Amino acid sequence: IEGFSFSPDGRKLLFIAQVKTVKSTADKHPDLPKATGIVVTDLMYKHWDEWVTTAPHPFVADFDGNAISNVKDILEGLPYESPMKPWGGIEQLAWSPESDKVAFTCRMKTGLAYAISTDSDIYEYDVNKGGFINLCKQNAKDSDGKDEMAGYDTNPQYSPDGKYIAWQSMERDGYEADQNRLCVMDRATGEKRFVSKAFESNVDAFLWNKDSRSIYFIGVWHGETQIYNIDLAGNDKLTRLTDGMHDYASLALC
């Protein structure tokens, strides 16, 4: 297990585990048990210092306080990864406040298309019924008139009241250094809006306020990483909360 998260009601467990997605040389040639060579016919065959032989998958299981049961692979039978390699972790998945949905980050591509694309999306898995939907492209257009959300969409977080879900979003496909914006979606209507337009740099780590009416985030501006707040109930007003020649690295509400 590479990461885990308990559901808000404490009755389920979300965890990450590796699933074999690529046949090994021994699988392809059982008559050559000592063979160590690798035949590469397509990308993506390697991440930095490791060969791609498995993919991380998110699993959901019942939890009774002592052990897990009824384990389900959200991406069962699919060659995709969630969280995404090489750096993704449990922050790319999230429980809904009602414990009945799981939002997860996934780039549903393989081979060359996977290697050259940054078009990941946020999906929502129904814990009770099974199956998932794409939250980024479900309506083909977002509220800003773009054809689709074509860049990296990562790190979903539900609002405490369950009415909204937010995530980090890049606009363009294939551009890893694109600006990280903060997207908020109304779960009832599917309407999306980018609430960080007043901030000209990247939205890094973010956190919902307990009242679901604002979002805190950290971002770099002029060489300093400061804490900001976006008032969702006040026309997405941006307020800088800290000042000084120092860097804040994370956020937490007490």
Q: Across the structure, where does each feature detected by a protein language model lie?
A:
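Terminal RNA-binding accessory module
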Residues: 227
